[in-house]
């Protein structure tokens, strides 16, 4: 434990907070190219085939990004926009693809939470 005199001379050193989305370079979104599209199984209590894409960002970082929603049209060499946001039951997947932007289409006929999935407003009768 430091003495009062030592604290006056040097002060305390602040802990550095780690950046969880370092690949984004402090940007809200980044563009990237799909290198591979695949599925992965989630951690223990859950069971599914979650769709993920390996993406090379414009700053040359290679990351895994989750593809939200039911069904997608992504394939190799597709251009996608990436945002932060991890997937709790997929270790190592810390990013999301944004639907309805670039080559990743929105979900047709989606009625609820449309803004999150790039869906058009349904025609009212």
Curated annotation (Swiss-Prot):
It is found in: Mitochondrion. Keywords: Mitochondrion, Ribonucleoprotein, Ribosomal protein. GO terms for cellular component: mitochondrion; small ribosomal subunit. GO terms for biological process: translation. Signal peptide: none annotated. CDD domains: Ribosomal_S12. GO terms for molecular function: structural constituent of ribosome. Protein S12 is involved in the translation initiation step. Belongs to the universal ribosomal protein uS12 family. This is Small ribosomal subunit protein uS12m.
């Amino acid at each position: 434990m430091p003495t009062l005199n030592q604290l006056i001379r040097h002060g305390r050193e602040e802990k550095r907070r780690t950046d969880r989305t370092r690949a984004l370079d402090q940007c809200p979104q980044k563009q990237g190219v799909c290198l591979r599209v695949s599925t992965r199984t989630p951690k223990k209590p859950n069971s599914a085939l979650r769709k993920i894409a390996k993406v090379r960002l414009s700053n040359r970082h290679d990351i895994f990004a989750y593809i939200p929603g039911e069904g997608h049209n992504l394939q190799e060499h597709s251009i996608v926009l990436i945002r932060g946001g991890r997937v709790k039951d997929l270790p190592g997947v810390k990013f999301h693809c944004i639907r309805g932007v670039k080559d990743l289409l929105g979900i047709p006929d989606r009625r609820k939470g449309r803004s999150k999935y790039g869906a058009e407003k349904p025609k009212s009768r």
